[in-house]
Regions:
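A structural signal for multi-pass alpha-helical bundles of membrane permease subunits
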Residues: 1-195
Length: 195
């Protein structure tokens, strides 16, 4: 969801130049410099009041918190795409959505995979947001929250269970990274300054 929405947002903000789009772009950039700790208690209360303290609600919260960096990365890459390619697609009869999904999105593939990896690693390893929003009383818990449960009172720890859970939690990220390694390198090379 983050990749789809933020790539479309970045495309619109980059290609449509108005005062409103500039303000929106800078709001996305500003959201990256505001630390989560500044908004966490307000966000936690708001999430509980609006009944976002469940897994679908967490998707919306992660979409909101992850959009700043994603829009910033997509905007930077879309600026390097020549307008001639999109104009040629328009001349061939594509509407804006067909142009985006048929022409621009395939070009954005390395950046999209880089954004996917960054967000997947962040969401998979995040402890504070699920702990604050979902809490301890529900049946839904993420792996970092469950690992914290294994620390008993007075510092007693079930180290065997903790290590087993941590190994199981690392395996999906390693597999995801190894399958996407080619695209990560392409994304880094595509974002490099050419001399």
């Amino acid at each position: 969801a983050i990749i789809l929405f933020t790539s479309m947002t970045a495309y619109y903000l980059t290609r449509v130049k108005t005062g409103v789009t500039n303000v929106l772009y800078y709001m996305f950039v500003f959201s990256m410099i505001v630390p989560f700790q500044m908004v966490m208690f307000t966000m936690s209360k708001l999430a509980n009041m609006t009944h976002l303290n469940n897994p679908p609600g967490m998707v919306l919260l992660y979409l909101g918190f992850g959009s700043g960096l994603s829009v910033f990365m997509f905007c930077g890459f879309i600026k390097s795409i020549p307008l001639d390619i999109e104009e040629a697609a328009m001349i061939d009869g594509c509407n804006p959505l067909q142009t985006f999904f048929g022409v621009v999105m395939p070009i954005l593939k390395p950046t999209a995979i880089t954004v996917a990896i960054l967000n997947a690693m962040w969401i998979w390893n995040d402890y504070l947001l699920p702990y604050l929003v979902i809490g301890l009383s529900t049946n839904y818990k993420t792996i970092p929250v469950v690992v914290q449960y294994l620390v008993g009172s007075y510092g007693a720890k079930d180290l065997g269970a903790m290590m087993a859970l941590l190994v199981l939690s690392v395996i999906p990220i390693i597999v995801f990274y190894l399958t996407c390694q080619k695209y990560i390198i392409e994304g880094v090379v595509a974002g490099a300054v050419k001399g």
